[in-house]
Regions:
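Juxtamembrane intracellular "pre-TM" segments in multi-pass secondary transporters
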Residues: 2-13, 198-232, 412
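Cytoplasmic helix-loop-helix junction between adjacent transmembrane helices
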Residues: 109-148, 339-340
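Helix-loop-helix hairpin linking two adjacent transmembrane segments in secondary transporters
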Residues: 143-195, 382
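Central cavity-lining transmembrane alpha-helices of secondary-active solute carriers
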Residues: 57-71, 270-282
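Helix-loop boundary and gating motifs at the non-cytosolic
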Residues: 11-60, 230-235, 240-258, 265
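Helix-breaking motifs and short loop linkers at transmembrane-helix boundaries and internal kinks
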Residues: 78, 99-105, 133, 259, ...
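C-terminal membrane-cytosol helix-exit motif in multi-pass small-molecule transporters
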Residues: 183-205, 395-403
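Structural signature of the two symmetry-related core transmembrane helices
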Residues: 81-96, 294-309
Length: 412
């Protein structure tokens, strides 16, 4: 492990438990303040559809801009300092929602709140890669699943709190109560981080500012010059594009075209997330033992086929099954891609690698609803979903040609 990382932290198992606990609290806090509370709050401030979309999506822009430099910075100044910076945003920024009275302020706060995941996410993943050894796939999958659990709980609890406080007729004070709960949970994540990450990073001896800047830029250059890293990250980005498209348009299709009710549409989407949540750690363990490329390829196919079928189905049970298959495919891809990126990188560049991976992930997530929306408007659901499905399949031969799996000891 790079001396500038977490060499001064407690044992590996303790560190992993700490990261999982902090990750759960942080994602739970973030989800409380996001869906469905955030779009409704933006509407209450007078935002139209475009404004609501900007308020929800602006934090993804933050991730695109800052994940790579945050990860690379952690390679230079240490993981602990960088993670705590992200936790400070998690812990303090939600309090800013309590003072928002205008839409422009909401957009600004959302942009800054996005720094929390942009800073903490890739650095925490780098720490997991640092200490997981040959179990990168399994441990990175557990870290991701814990975050998914926080999101799964945070979103409905936030919505239920708002329902108790007035629902669609809730006033600004009702929204502020939910945001206060988010702030307190984020503060709990920060407090846990301050106590459990109390030991300092081991300083990089003999490094002045110019040398640190050189290490920072060198890490980014070496990572982005590795086409294996970029291609593997792109597979995750393309899969995430289809997931973002499904997230945006599956509920609309289910209600407006398939004739299902809103609750059924939510169940179809929810079962996909639950399957991903359950399957990821197992798929990560399998990728550690049997290789990552086969799982990524199989996962892309498992996502492509059900994605293309969705516009041709109207039965609730069948759509549920299709959603489950897509969720399994997502687990195949996401359990292996981040670990494969870490396999290709030198340990001292794990931060930059996870930052690059996270940036491409966010680009895919942001592009999915936008690109698919344009395609649906121009060509309809059937052709639009077929095009995205074709992109998933077309990426496979390029991935197999570009990426050759190597023994994991190559990066030590």
């Amino acid at each position: 492990m790079n001396p500038a990382t977490l060499t001064a932290l407690p044992t590996s198992d303790t560190t992993l438990r700490t990261l999982f606990s902090i990750g759960f609290l942080a994602r739970f806090s973030y989800a409380l303040a996001r869906n469905p509370v955030l779009p409704l709050f933006a509407a209450a401030l007078g935002a139209g559809p475009e404004g609501i979309g900007l308020a929800v999506g602006i934090s993804t822009v933050t991730g695109i801009l800052f994940k790579m430099p945050s990860g690379a910075l952690s390679d230079v100044i240490g993981r602990r300092r960088t993670m705590l910076a992200g936790l400070v945003v998690f812990g303090l920024m939600p309090f800013a929602y309590l003072f928002i009275t205008h839409y422009a302020a909401l957009v600004a706060v959302r942009f800054l709140h996005g720094l929390a995941t942009a800073i903490y996410g890739p650095v925490a993943m780098a720490v997991v890669a640092d200490i997981a050894g040959a179990r990168k796939g399994e441990m990175l999958s557990w870290f991701s699943s814990v975050g998914i659990a926080g999101t799964l709980l945070g979103a409905p609890i936030g919505g239920y709190l708002l329902f108790l406080l007035g629902g669609e007729q809730a006033g600004l004070n009702s929204y502020r109560t939910v945001f206060l709960c988010s702030a307190l949970t984020g503060a709990a994540a920060l407090t846990l981080g301050l106590f459990t990450l109390r030991n300092g990073d081991k300083p990089a001896e003999g490094k002045n500012l110019a040398q640190r800047i050189h290490l920072f830029t060198q890490g980014i250059r070496e990572v982005v010059a590795d086409r294996r890293v970029l291609m593997t990250s792109s597979m995750e980005g393309i899969q995430n594009m289809s997931m973002g498209a499904l997230e945006a348009f599956l509920p609309v299709y289910a209600v407006s075209m398939a004739g299902l009710n809103v609750f059924q549409a939510g169940l179809i989407w929810g079962v996909q997330i639950v399957v991903t949540f359950i399957a990821k750690p197992l798929m990560g363990r399998i990728s550690d033992r049997w290789g990552r490329r086969p799982l990524i390829v199989a996962g892309m196919l498992l996502c492509a086929v059900p994605f293309a079928l969705v516009p041709h189905l109207t039965d609730f049970v069948v759509l549920m099954l299709v959603g489950m298959v897509f969720g399994l495919g997502e687990a195949f891809v996401t359990s292996s891609s981040a670990a494969l990126v870490a396999d290709f990188c030198k340990a001292r560049h794990y931060g930059a690698a996870m930052g690059t991976f996270g940036t491409i992930f966010d680009v895919g997530h942001a592009a999915g609803p936008i690109v698919t929306g344009l395609l649906v408007a121009s060509l309809g659901y059937g052709a639009a979903f077929a095009i995205v499905s074709t992109l998933l399949c077309a990426s496979i031969p390029l991935f197999l040609y570009t990426v050759r799996e190597e023994p994991q000891t190559a990066n030590l």
